[in-house]
Structures are given as C-alpha cells and as structure tokens.
C-alpha cells in the first residue's frame, strides 16, 4: 500500500509554493471611478510612452474627483523582464525612499466638477532611480489600500544603432521597395551571439 503523502511530495509542494511566492506578477490595477486622467510620461520628450533614459525625469499626474485632498502615497518596485518583482532590494535600485507621500496637489476652482489634481515627479528631492530596468509605480491611499499601478521602463544606452535607407537597386521595385541597413556600434559592450542578441 502506498503512502498518501511522502517526504518527496512534501518537498515538491514546498518548492512549488516558494516559486509561486517569488514569481508573482504584479498586476496592472485599474483605478477606481473617482480617479481620472492618469498619465505617466517623460517630462523632456513629447510622447506618452513611459520610457526614460537613466537620469531623466518621468511625471505621474492624476485627478481625484472627490476633491477632498486625500493623502496618497507611492511605492516604486523594480521588476524583471517579465514584470515579476525582482529580488533586488530598494537600496540597490533607488537613492532615497522607495515609498513616500505625493506632496504636490491642487484643488480645482471655478469648475463644474470639483477635483484635486495630483502630480509626482521622479526623480525628486526624496528619491532617484539608479538602476535601469522595468518598474511598477503603485499609488495607495492613507489606509494603505492599492488605488492603481502604472508600469514604466528605465534604460541605459549601451550600444549605438545607425540606420540608412536606400531605394531598391531592382528597377521593378525602385519606387515601391527600400533597402534598410543597420549598423550596431557595440563599443566595449560584449555580444557573444549577434544573431540572437541583436
């Protein structure tokens, strides 16, 4: 007669549970109905993709239609390539506090709908990012309940890429096709297998 639960099964269960705990994907949390106009965008460039170069600034802004000056806090979490929380401690990827209050807010006046507008710039006097990677920005209320999350990317340019576009040398395709050539200058960055890594 077989044992219903052996030491081997117990070890396998513990191992699987530990993988589940350490590889939890941080979900994108949708904001409640009173939170509107959420934007997370770079401050220097004129596009809305939340992607910045290491050392550049990104800004979060949103409106709370309750209009009652809530005490919101933010937390920045470093993630791996698959948006799983990384095992890196905050002191390795941040200078300053990983959580703090959102201190910049203004109440609307002379408007049909009352609201409070909140803004957060990163870096700020209390925090700066010192490591490239994927990040989750969490916003919580004064009861530490998660209100919403936003993802952003911080990158470090390690190679330069040049591109040139030329008309096709084939006469039949001269007006409809192009040749595109890329040049990757790796500098001191080591690439072992260009076919897979570029």
State the predicted function of each range.
Residues 114-127, 132-139:
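Ligand-binding face of N-terminal immunoglobulin V-set domains in extracellular IgSF glycoproteins
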Residues 36-78, 172-186:
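Contiguous beta-strand segments within globular domains
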Residues 154-177:
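Low-complexity, Pro/Ser/Thr- and charge-rich linker/hinge segments at domain boundaries
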Residues 66-70, 128-129, 189-196:
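A short beta-turn/strand-edge loop motif at beta-sheet boundaries
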Residues 81-83, 127, 141-147:
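Short acidic/polar inter-strand loop motif in beta-rich domains
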Residues 1-25:
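Bacterial Sec-dependent N-terminal signal peptides
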Residues 95-115:
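Extended, solvent-exposed segments with strong compositional bias
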Residues 26-40, 159:
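Proline/serine/threonine-rich low-complexity linkers at boundaries of modular beta-sandwich domains
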């Amino acid at each position: 007669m077989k044992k219903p639960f052996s030491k081997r099964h117990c070890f396998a269960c513990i191992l699987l549970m530990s993988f589940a705990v350490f590889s939890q994907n941080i979900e994108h949390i949708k904001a409640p109905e009173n939170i509107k106009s959420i934007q997370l965008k770079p401050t220097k460039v004129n596009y809305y993709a939340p992607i910045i170069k290491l050392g550049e600034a990104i800004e979060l802004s949103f409106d709370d239609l309750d209009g009652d000056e809530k005490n919101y806090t933010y937390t920045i979490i470093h993630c791996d390539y698959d948006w799983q929380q990384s095992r890196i401690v905050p002191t390795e990827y941040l200078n300053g506090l990983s959580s703090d209050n959102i201190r910049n807010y203004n109440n609307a006046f002379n408007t049909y709908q009352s609201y409070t507008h909140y803004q957060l710039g990163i870096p700020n006097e209390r925090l700066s990012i010192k490591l490239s990677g994927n990040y989750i920005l969490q916003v919580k209320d004064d009861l530490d309940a998660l209100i919403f999350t936003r993802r952003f990317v911080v990158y470090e340019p390690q190679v330069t890429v040049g591109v040139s576009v030329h008309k096709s040398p084939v006469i039949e395709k001269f007006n409809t096709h192009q040749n595109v050539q890329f040049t990757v200058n790796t500098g001191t960055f080591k690439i072992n297998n260009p076919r897979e890594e570029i």
